[in-house]
């Protein structure tokens, strides 16, 4: 059974355009409700969270209508981080969790992703079954079994209190000046409050959402404003989240960025020293830098690579029993604490390292020298398959021959946008540029 509607991170699209319409959200809610509440079953609960996009109101109401039509009782959380939905699904014994968000995308986009009762994102197989239900006639509940919906006020507070329990007991952030950039997104209240309650002096950025400014010149994909705040306020560190707070980028005291690879390297080394890194293994995607792999190997640790997407990182971690993984983009998954990437929890672990060692952020955020890496994205028209073009395939084969033994090449379609991502790594930067530019030109000609 294959998926057509679901991508690597749920269903995404432009708001009010298929599939992100009220009509589709209603049917998707009904299909998910029927999947999680077989005909004749009781009235299980669903938790629904969202980020701060204007279209979230529309999709929230449509999903609620679809879910209640199949007998599910809906608890509306309001704006909360994606990892909060995973946490609350499990802690509140819900049968299903739903997050309405397009993560780091602009406000015009939105998305819907589902969490199972264990708090983990659904498998490809479960999503395919929901699509199959969606394609048919969805049987509604009997009139007396229609579900109820209510808004709950303490969901965010429950998550915030849990976040604080993951911080080392007895450790405080007193005297530490922290810039926190919430991307005008889902964590705009939770993240500053948690940091302040742990003792930090907090300088908030991106905490004035208006429905249209999520990820706009702020957050993990646009950390310039946070970097300027770090320098202007003489802050010790900056933490940049994306719109749904499931990814993080760290800024040192000079405003310089550390991506997910550097964060994972620090955590892996520290956890290995403390005997906490299970089986000496870190799980990361094919996009992670070759320098990370070399750093781990020099310490007798292993890198397990997966396809791109934090869900595939989590699936590999669960299969192998490993407890640390993530993506270069800033998804950091720590299954000792959470069921999905959690930018705030990862930020807290970085701050704990600073507080425990007394070292500066710049010392901790540079664990290894990166191998030169070049990534370019090429947009293509709907219905096109540029990677199947003979000319593109010939250029790719030539690039593989030229890089053989000297570097690494990765070309893939984005799972969330109509983009071809062309990435290469090589110590020879001239060769690196030539290879990527030739492939990009060929893909553009075919797109």
From Swiss-Prot:
- Tell me one GO molecular function of this protein: phosphomannomutase activity
Q: Which domain of life is it from?
A: Bacteria
Organism field: Cereibacter sphaeroides (strain ATCC 17029 / ATH 2.4.9)
Q: Name one GO cellular component term.
A: cytosol
Sites bearing Phosphoserine, chain numbering: 103
| PANTHER family listed in its UniProt record | PHOSPHOGLUCOMUTASE (ALPHA-D-GLUCOSE-1,6-BISPHOSPHATE-DEPENDENT), PHOSPHOHEXOSE MUTASE
- Catalytic residues, chain numbering: 103
Write out the similarity annotation.
Belongs to the phosphohexose mutase family.
**Gene name for this UniProt entry:** glmM
Q: Which cofactor does it need?
A: Mg(2+)
What does the entry's PTM section describe? Activated by phosphorylation.
Does this entry carry the keyword Metal-binding? Answer: yes
State the reactions this protein catalyses. Answer: alpha-D-glucosamine 1-phosphate = D-glucosamine 6-phosphate
Q: What is this enzyme's EC?
A: 5.4.2.10
Task: List the coiled-coil residues.
Answer: none
Q: What job does the chain carry out? A: Catalyzes the conversion of glucosamine-6-phosphate to glucosamine-1-phosphate.
Q: Which CDD domains match?
A: GlmM
Keywords from the named record = Isomerase, Magnesium, Metal-binding, Phosphoprotein
Provide the protein name: Phosphoglucosamine mutase
């Amino acid at each position: 059974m294959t998926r057509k509607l679901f991508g690597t991170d749920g269903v995404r699209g432009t708001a009010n355009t298929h599939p992100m319409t009220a009509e589709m959200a209603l049917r998707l809610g009904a299909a998910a409700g029927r999947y999680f509440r077989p005909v004749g079953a009781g009235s299980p609960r669903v938790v629904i969270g969202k980020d701060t996009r204007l279209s979230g109101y529309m999709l929230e109401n449509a999903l609620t209508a679809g879910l209640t039509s199949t007998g599910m009782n809906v608890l509306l959380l309001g704006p909360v981080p994606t990892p909060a939905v995973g946490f609350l699904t499990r802690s509140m014994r819900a049968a299903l969790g739903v997050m309405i968000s397009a993560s780091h995308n602009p406000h015009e986009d939105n998305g819907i992703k589902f969490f199972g009762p264990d708090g983990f994102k659904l498998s490809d197989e479960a999503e395919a079954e929901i699509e199959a239900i969606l394609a048919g006639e969805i049987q509604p509940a009997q009139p007396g079994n229609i579900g109820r919906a209510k808004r709950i006020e303490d969901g965010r507070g429950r998550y915030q209190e849990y976040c604080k329990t993951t911080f080392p007991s007895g450790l405080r952030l007193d005297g530490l000046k922290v810039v926190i950039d919430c991307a005008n997104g889902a964590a705009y209240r939770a993240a500053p409050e948690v940091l302040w309650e742990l003792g930090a002096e907090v300088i908030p950025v991106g905490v004035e959402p208006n429905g249209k400014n999520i990820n706009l010149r702020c957050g993990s994909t646009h950390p310039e404003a946070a970097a300027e705040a770090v320098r202007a306020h003489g802050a010790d560190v900056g933490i940049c989240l994306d719109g749904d707070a499931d990814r993080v980028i760290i800024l040192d005291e000079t405003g310089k960025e550390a991506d997910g690879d550097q964060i994972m390297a620090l955590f892996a080394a520290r956890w290995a020293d403390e005997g906490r890194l299970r089986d000496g293994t870190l799980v990361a995607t094919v996009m992670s830098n070759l320098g990370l792999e070399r750093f781990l190997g020099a310490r007798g640790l292993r890198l397990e690579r997966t396809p791109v997407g934090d869900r595939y990182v989590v699936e590999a971690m669960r299969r192998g029993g490993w407890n640390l993984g993530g993506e270069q983009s800033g998804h950091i998954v720590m299954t000792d604490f959470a069921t999905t990437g959690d930018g705030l929890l990862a930020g807290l672990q970085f701050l704990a390292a600073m507080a425990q060692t007394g070292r500066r952020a710049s010392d901790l955020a540079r664990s290894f020298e990166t191998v030169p890496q070049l990534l370019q994205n090429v947009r293509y028209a709907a219905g096109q398959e540029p990677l199947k073009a003979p000319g593109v395939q010939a250029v790719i084969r030539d690039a593989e021959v030229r890089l053989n033994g000297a570097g690494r090449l990765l070309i893939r379609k984005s799972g969330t946008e109509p983009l071809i991502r062309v990435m290469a790594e090589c110590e020879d930067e001239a060769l690196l540029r030539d290879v990527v530019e030739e492939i990009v030109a060929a893909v553009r000609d075919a797109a």
